[in-house]
Amino acid sequence: MLWFKNLMVYRLSREVSLSADEMEKQLSAFSFTPCGSQDMAKTGWVSPMGSHSDALTHTVNGQIVICVRKEEKILPSPVIKQELQDKIERLEGEQHRKLKKTEKDSLKDEVLHSLLPRAFSRFNQTFLWIDTVNDLIMVDAASAKRAEDTLALLRKSLGSLPVVPLTLENPIELTLTEWVRSKTLPAGFALMDEAELKAILEDGGVIRCKKQDLFSDEIAVHIEAGKLVTKLALDWQERIQLVLSDDGSLKRLKFADTLRDQNEDIDREDFAQRFDADFILMTSELAALIKNLIEALGGEAQH
């Protein structure tokens, strides 16, 4: 079962019909196909249930999960460089002259084409969770670029996708800094022992703390000197641990064992039933966490 490790949260900026049946047809036109002999990379949709289903969408209680697979050919630059150099030296020796830059560029293309069929592939998968109840889309990605690339494929598949990053009324770093400065956190949240502080001025430095008492005088001095808390490790209701960043992303999600074990009574051999139970559990917990976080951070910006 997928347990999201990261969350990039996006708001649907206008009402849009996202029916799983319609999406299934739209995504199938962009389903994943492996790289051909001359492809550097391929991206497409696969079943979120892996080999247990052919369906490209899976829906439970208004929550839809979909999955993107990306295949990239790995061609280490030293290998390309050596192969190209060998070819240049051989041709220059045969023709008794130095090759022009345009000729070398052309040779590089030839080298790439000759190496591609023998290159190894690297695969990665990115899950998206569409919360049709709360009009949110969550991407399990650690970087904004990967999330945006994934949403770009969804937009291409659906024809349009009016989403914007979830934006809060108050700058997140100011709220996080005040929590640490005042040693007071909203109900349900507890401070852990990791943070990042940045100076307001770009050349003012960055401090990364691990295994640190964040309510200590040492941290207070940095805040008094004008540094802002830009990342903060939090515990939510002893159920989920996370690192909240000033861009609103949630990283290094860790679900408590007591939470993950709630569906242990379901036979693991019954993959579909266990998948549904875990998906319902995960999405309900994360939806509650997101709601609490939005409130704790001062509410969502009104567009």
Swiss-Prot record:
Residues making up the signal peptide according to the UniProt record: none
UniProt keyword list: Cytoplasm, DNA recombination
Cell location: Cytoplasm, Nucleoid
Record keyword Endoplasmic reticulum present: no
UniProt keyword annotation of Cytoplasm present: yes
GO BP annotations, alphabetical order: DNA recombination; regulation of DNA recombination
Pfam families for this protein: RdgC (PF04381)
Function statement: May be involved in recombination.
Identification of the protein by name: Recombination-associated protein RdgC
Organism of derivation: Yersinia pestis bv. Antiqua (strain Angola)
